[in-house]
Amino acid sequence: MGRLLALVVGAALVSSACGGCVEVDSETEAVYGMTFKILCISCKRRSETNAETFTEWTFRQKGTEEFVKILRYENEVLQLEEDERFEGRVVWNGSRGTKDLQDLSIFITNVTYNHSGDYECHVYRLLFFENYEHNTSVVKKIHIEVVDKANRDMASIVSEIMMYVLIVVLTIWLVAEMIYCYKKIAAATETAAQENASEYLAITSESKENCTGVQVAE
């Protein structure tokens, strides 16, 4: 849960035109038959510098030795290589509407065991300065394991336990507050009743005295 929250926050920051950029590691465990996002984020050192970026993704299947290119994304065009393992399964999920890519993530739909292995996200960036241009390149490496069902990590378990503990504590606090308020209201009601009774007795006693005085005068 904690890691998922970090991914969400990182994606929100990267996708915001005016926001910052946070590099977040990708999840590494994909579930068979499900859609899986491989995260690749490469931030510029200086956000105010204009740049153009393109990426190439390569893949080495588990048990093999060579990397093969599976896609290239440049100028908002996704070019997929002919590879039956990824045919109709790869979807671009990175930056859109800009040549200055910082989020270069992809989706793999309907994951199979053939997608287990090592992925490389190659980031090629051309930086434009006032009097010159500068090329940079970065390689993000991600190892993916495909499993039958999701395994919960320790952070997720701890987060859920803390959530239930917080709910229990808040419930106890709420019950205690209700009991306190009830007792306070009951005490105030009892005090008011006693005061009313005292006033009633005083008035009754005064009335009797007045009646006695009238009878004596007669």
UniProtKB/Swiss-Prot annotation:
GO terms for cellular component: extracellular region; intercalated disc; node of Ranvier; perikaryon; plasma membrane; T-tubule; voltage-gated sodium channel complex
Effect of residue 106 to T: In DEE52; uncertain significance
Topology Cytoplasmic: residue spans: 180-218
GO aspect biological process, one term: neuronal action potential propagation
Key words, A-Z: Atrial fibrillation, Brugada syndrome, Cell adhesion, Cell membrane, Cell projection, Disease variant, Disulfide bond, Epilepsy, Glycoprotein, Immunoglobulin domain, Ion transport, Membrane, Secreted, Signal, Sodium, Sodium transport, Transmembrane, Transmembrane helix, Transport
Residue ranges of domain Ig-like C2-type in the record: 22-150
All ranges on the Extracellular side of the membrane: 19-157
Effect of residue 153 to N: In ATFB13; the mutant results in reduced sodium currents when coexpressed with SCN5A in a heterologous expression system
Pfam families listed in its UniProt record: V-set
Keyword Transmembrane found: yes
Effect on the protein of changing residue 87 to Q: Found in a patient with non-specific cardiac conduction defects; likely pathogenic
Record Gene3D superfamilies: Immunoglobulins
Membrane-crossing residue ranges in chain numbering: 158-179
Extent of the signal sequence: 1-18
Annotated effect of mutating residue 85 to H: In ATFB13; the mutant results in highly reduced sodium currents and altered channel gating when coexpressed with SCN5A in a heterologous expression system
Reported tissue expression: The overall expression of isoform 1 and isoform 2 is very similar. Isoform 1 is abundantly expressed in skeletal muscle, heart and brain. Isoform 2 is highly expressed in brain and skeletal muscle and present at a very low level in heart, placenta, lung, liver, kidney and pancreas. In brain, isoform 2 is most abundant in the cerebellum, followed by the cerebral cortex and occipital lobe, while isoform 1 levels are higher in the cortex compared to the cerebellum.
Effect on the protein of changing residue 25 to N: Found in a patient with idiopathic childhood epilepsy; likely pathogenic; de novo mutation; loss of function in increasing sodium channel activity
Disulfide linkage: 21-43, 40-121
Described purpose of this protein according to its UniProt entry: Regulatory subunit of multiple voltage-gated sodium (Nav) channels directly mediating the depolarization of excitable membranes. Navs, also called VGSCs (voltage-gated sodium channels) or VDSCs (voltage-dependent sodium channels), operate by switching between closed and open conformations depending on the voltage difference across the membrane. In the open conformation they allow Na(+) ions to selectively pass through the pore, along their electrochemical gradient.
Disease as annotated in the protein's UniProt record: Generalized epilepsy with febrile seizures plus 1: A rare autosomal dominant, familial condition with incomplete penetrance and large intrafamilial variability. Patients display febrile seizures persisting sometimes beyond the age of 6 years and/or a variety of afebrile seizure types. This disease combines febrile seizures, generalized seizures often precipitated by fever at age 6 years or more, and partial seizures, with a variable degree of severity.
This protein's name: Sodium channel regulatory subunit beta-1
UniProt organism field: Homo sapiens (Human)
Gene: SCN1B
